[in-house]
């Protein structure tokens, strides 16, 4: 009986973990900043895609009317915004928003605008 209860509890935990999603972003090899709601950053990659420029987490800041980018990816490391060439807004309904980076999150006293070189929105 004890083993059955333990197995059932472990099954519930595994199913819970599989269903937990986080707001994450990556910067792929083409410099495309992609948003998603996934458990792992690597789930944002399409087949044949790589993520050499890192990633992190994002949240919508209603007060600022912006997307706040923060943290780092355990899969790919800290984001390097110098390589952003375009932003894929499709996950956010195709609507553009200012992008602001919080380098010392959760401290929001320093906010850095993300400016892409040769930016073209997809």
What residue spans do the PLM features occupy?
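Intrinsic low-complexity, intrinsically disordered or marginally ordered coil/linker segments
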Residues: 2-122
């Amino acid at each position: 009986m004890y083993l059955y209860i333990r197995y059932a509890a472990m099954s519930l935990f595994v199913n819970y973990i599989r269903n937990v999603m986080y707001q994450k972003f990556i910067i792929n090899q083409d410099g495309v900043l992609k948003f998603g709601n996934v458990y792992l950053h690597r789930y944002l990659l399409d087949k044949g895609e790589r993520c050499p420029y890192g990633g992190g987490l994002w949240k919508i800041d209603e007060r600022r009317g912006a997307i706040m980018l923060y943290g780092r990816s355990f899969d790919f490391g800290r984001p390097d915004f110098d390589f952003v060439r375009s932003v894929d807004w499709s996950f956010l309904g195709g609507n553009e928003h200012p992008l602001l980076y919080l380098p010392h999150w959760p401290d929001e006293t320093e906010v850095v605008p993300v400016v892409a070189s040769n930016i073209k929105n997809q």
